[in-house]
Amino acid sequence: MSNVDHAEIAKFEALAHRWWDRESEFKPLHDINPLRVNWIDERVNLAGKKVLDVGCGGGILSEAMAQRGATVMGIDMGEAPLAVAQLHQLESGVSVEYRQITAEALAEEMPEQFDVVTCLEMLEHVPDPSSVIRACFRMVKPGGQVFFSTINRNPKAYLFAIIGAEYIMKLLPRGTHDFKKFIRPSELGAWSRQAGLTVKDIIGLTYNPLTKHYKLASDVDVNYMIQTLREE
């Protein structure tokens, strides 16, 4: 059975043409992207690395990592976001290889091929997140690193990520997230360890509604990112 939620794919298909509009529903992704890329780059030095971006969507993260000197492949199951990503790189001049394939299928085809694997804001949109994590482990080289980001599952996360972001501040379209699919750090850590990855670091991402700015912080109550290592 394919680890794909077609309703989730359809959500992003409908919005794909606005992916690179910095004032659209994707503004939060554009705003947090520099913070995330810097955090990753500080830990792995992206220049010269072979990187896989799982759940790449329209290519915001993929392009940013390529601009840092990485050789990037982006994969997604959404046809429209991938078409947008491919068109945008013609405009930006940034080279990324995009493919419509699941992480699990690519893991069969390309085991131990990547220095770095990123899987950001994707795990909460698939039926079986642990399956994606296992696939990421298989695709990263021994000694390589895998980065995940998602949203915590607790009352504060519900208040901020759904009520606040989707209904009050309208940062995201209503229905973007399903609270039941949010993932606690303890769960993400356990799935990573079960897959064979060692958790090295965790960082939170907070939003100030007054300044409308995001920053990295120790607070992992809502959005957070983890760094994991496949030991040699």
Curated annotation (Swiss-Prot):
Main function: O-methyltransferase that catalyzes the 2 O-methylation steps in the ubiquinone biosynthetic pathway.
EC numbers: 2.1.1.222, 2.1.1.64
Sites where the protein binds S-adenosyl-L-methionine: R36, G55, D76, L120
Entry-linked InterPro entries: SAM-dependent_MTases_sf, UbiG_MeTrfase
Similarity comment: Belongs to the methyltransferase superfamily. UbiG/COQ3 family.
Single GO MF descriptor: polyprenyldihydroxybenzoate methyltransferase activity
Pathways per UniProt: Cofactor biosynthesis; ubiquinone biosynthesis
Source taxon at top rank: Bacteria
A Pfam short name: Methyltransf_23
Name under which the protein is recorded: Ubiquinone biosynthesis O-methyltransferase
Broadest EC class assigned to this enzyme: transferase
HAMAP family per the UniProt record, alphabetical: UbiG (MF_00472)
GO BP, sorted A to Z: methylation
Keyword Secreted set for record: no
Reactions that this protein is recorded to catalyse: a 3-demethylubiquinol + S-adenosyl-L-methionine = a ubiquinol + S-adenosyl-L-homocysteine + H(+); a 3-(all-trans-polyprenyl)benzene-1,2-diol + S-adenosyl-L-methionine = a 2-methoxy-6-(all-trans-polyprenyl)phenol + S-adenosyl-L-homocysteine + H(+)
Keywords on record: Methyltransferase, S-adenosyl-L-methionine, Transferase, Ubiquinone biosynthesis
Organism field: Pseudomonas fluorescens (strain SBW25)
